[in-house]
Amino acid sequence: MPKVGSKVLLIDIGGTNIRTCTAFVGSSELHNENKEKISANTNIDDYIKSIASVETNLDHVVCSVAGPKMNDQINMTNRNYQINSQQMQSMLGVQNFYLLNDRESIGYFFNSRTEND
C-alpha cells in the first residue's frame, strides 16, 4: 500500500487526448492538471517519460488507458500504442506503475466517492 503523502502522477490516455495531473496519497486535491491532444506519430513511452521527468519526488504512477489489459499490458484499441506496466515502472524509476483499463479506473472512481461528493 502506498504511503500517505507520497506523490502520484495520474495519466489518462484516450484516443485523441492525454490528461495528466499529480496528487498525494491521502488527499483528494489534484495539482498541475493538463490536457493535450496526441498525434498518431507520438511515441507514448517518450511522452510519459517527459511528463514524469518534470515531477520531483515522484513515487507512483497510475495510468488509465483505453483498451483491454492482458498480462500487465494494454494494447490500445484506437491507437498503435502498447503500454507495459513493468517496463514503464523500470523506465521511470518509480515504486509502482499501476496500469488500468479506462473502464476499470471509472469503477475505482465511483467506489471512492461518498454521498456528499
What is each stretch, according to the model?
Residues M1, I51-S53, Q87:
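Short, flexible, glycine/charge-rich loop motifs used to bind or transfer phosphoryl groups or to couple energy/partner
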Residues M1, T42, E115-D117:
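Short coil-to-helix leader/linker segments, especially the first N-terminal amphipathic alpha-helix
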Residues K3-S50:
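Short glycine-rich, Thr/Ser-proximal phosphate-binding strand/loop in the N-terminal lobe
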Residues E55-L99, E104-N116:
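Short beta-strand-loop/turn "lid" adjacent to the catalytic site in phosphate-handling enzymes
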